Amino acid sequence: MTKIFKSNAAKAKQFFADKMAFTTGPVEISHQIEKKEDVVIIDVRGSKDFKKGHVQGAINLPQEKWGTLAGLRRDTMNIIYCYAQNCHLGAHAAMQFATKGYSVMEMDGGFESWKENGLKIVK
């Protein structure tokens, strides 16, 4: 039993280290926007939802257009977000873009978390 706990602890440590390296939160992204840091924000939600509201400066790249890689940049961090915490679309997009050689992070909680934090929404 002790071996299992030690094994789980090591796996948990690695999981959370990886999670922190490849995810960021809405408040952190908002600060990056305010400071005009060089990041690309990619909204992978559908175009109708994007038009209803999105993160300032975000580029809409819905799933049917992922193959174009439109808006992604190789020289900076690309931050991906989708609908909400339980939406895995952002993670799938991030994995696909990383496979193509792009530096990526995913925004925790998606657009829903952005709204819940009362951050600026552009229409």
Predicted regions: what is each one?
Residues V40, I59, M105:
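Conserved beta-strand positions in the Rossmann-like core of class I SAM-dependent methyltransferases
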Residues G67, L72-K115:
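Catalytic cysteine-centered active loop of the rhodanese-like fold, especially the PTP/DSP P-loop
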Residues D43, A58, F97:
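Terminal peptide-recognition signature
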Residues I59, M77, I121-K123:
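Short, hinge-like loop/turn segments at secondary-structure boundaries
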Residues I59-G67:
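Glycine-rich, highly charged phosphate/nucleotide-binding loops
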Residues H54-Q56, K100:
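Short, structured coil segments at secondary-structure junctions
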Residues M1-I41, R45-D49, K123:
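Flexible, polar/low-complexity N-terminal or interdomain linker segments that lie immediately upstream
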